Amino acid sequence: GERVAADVVVSNADAAWTYSRLLPSVARRRWTDRKLDRARYSMSLFVWYFGTRRRYDDVPHHTILVGPRYRQLLDDIFERKVLASDFSLYLHRPTASDPSLAPAGGDAFYVLSPVPHLDSGVDWAARAEPYRQAIERHLEATLLPGLRDAIVTSRVMTPLDFRDRLLSPNGAAFSFEPVLTQSAWFRPHNRSEELDGWIARHAKGWT
């Protein structure tokens, strides 16, 4: 490793990762290994980015598609920690506001599907593409006719990416689950309580 002297350290990684990996346990009074291990972590997300060769001008910038069993789906995600066969989706079409974000005549999208974090044991290496295809079929049947044949670029993010690329424990998309004892003041603060000059700014929202 390399030792770097600094007056201020800014971490954009997840709070739990930052404290457990960058600050030795002897220097932590509040965010101990025991507390981090016992914390409850938020759901994760399956994110599909895609571009199309045609425009869908009747689709707004933001669309939420709520499935038929929303409450039960939340139980699947947070309590049972299973990947359900149905989903509720958020569809983002930025080209509705700025057409320059895609080539002329095309559209850009991403769609988010809430899924359980990695404690679920879901084999995302095997399940990612079938899950993407299920979302594709649903969008084609509800909002985006002819979607399959219109796609020109496609990329997915799974909970594995949240863990490995964004350094989020358990692949959680929103760090600690916002239960009462982990909400507001009880969440990690942007200015660390553990060490002067340690500023932890979490892109997925600590506060």
Annotate each PLM feature.
Residues V10, F50, V111, I135, ...:
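Hydrophobic, well-ordered secondary-structure elements that form the walls
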Residues G1-P103:
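Mid-domain catalytic core of redox enzymes
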Residues R40, P99-G106, L195-H202:
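Short glycine/proline-enriched loop/turn "hinge" motifs that connect secondary-structure elements
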Residues A16-R21, P103-H138:
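Conserved FAD/dinucleotide-binding core of flavoprotein oxidoreductases
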Residues A84-Y90, P145-T207:
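A glycine-rich dinucleotide-binding beta-alpha-beta segment and adjacent secondary-structure elements
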